[in-house]
Regions:
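Long amphipathic alpha-helical segments used for membrane anchoring, targeting, substrate engagement
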Residues: 1-4, 54-75
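N-terminal intrinsically disordered, cationic/polar leader segments
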Residues: 4-26
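Amphipathic, positively biased hydrophobic alpha-helical segments used for protein targeting
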Residues: 16-20, 31, 58, 62
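A short interface-forming secondary-structure element
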Residues: 25-37
Length: 75
């Protein structure tokens, strides 16, 4: 399972796998401003959160009924 999350109108993309490990980061050069590093950091975090949400939704869809009664958080 993999999912790609985006932020900033798709200028930052983060891909993660089913273990929530980041496997790829794509940055549009427009978002790389040495005077505003904080914005880039925030966009990367937002894209990662978006990807995690997509993975969690996919896991719920595929395994939610099977694991629902086990009390696993966020599932």
């Amino acid at each position: 399972i993999t999912a790609t999350g985006s932020a900033g109108g798709n200028i930052v993309n983060v891909t993660i796998n089913g273990k929530f490990e980041i496997t790829n980061v794509k940055l549009d050069p427009i978002c790389v401003d040495p005077r505003d590093v904080q914005m880039l950091q925030d966009l990367i975090i937002a894209a990662h959160h978006d990807a995690m949400s997509k993975i969690q939704d996919e896991l719920k869809t595929k395994y939610g009924s099977m694991l629902g009664g086990m009390g696993i958080p966020n599932l």
